[in-house]
């Protein structure tokens, strides 16, 4: 279980969250929905320790770890896909996949097919549409087989089917 407690976020005089809490069960789909500009993306940044809060994973405090161990925790347990997916521009999607394979991640043929990854492998991120970038980023995140997958994306049929 992942819990965030006592999350407070303000920008200037505007308070977005005051003493907010959140709980999500691993292996379950949890959806945060709201209007554009309502703070969904800001709230999701708390999962990356971008804000001060109490952060518990399986009952253990993570927010009190030193920076190096927090980063290890994030890498070992979380994968995040941002609204604007992040890629290394000089690498094709296939090169991104190969880099993950070098780190021990495995291809997932079912997701590869469902997300339409094969036709994207020889393309550079800058040549992809927004939807193609999102699908590629989701696939790369899934290759890591995270316990917690955070998707700050617009849903499309191909992503919803996974």
Functional labels for PLM-detected ranges:
Residues 138:
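Hydrophobic anchor residue at the start of the ABC signature
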Residues 84, 90-103:
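Q-loop/switch helix immediately C-terminal to the Walker
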Residues 48:
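Helix-to-loop junction immediately C-terminal to a conserved catalytic motif
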Residues 33-35:
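The feature captures the beta-strand-to-loop junction immediately N-terminal to the Walker
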Residues 124-128, 132:
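Conserved ABC ATPase signature
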Residues 105-120:
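Conserved ABC ATPase "signature" region
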Residues 62-79:
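ABC ATPase NBD coupling module
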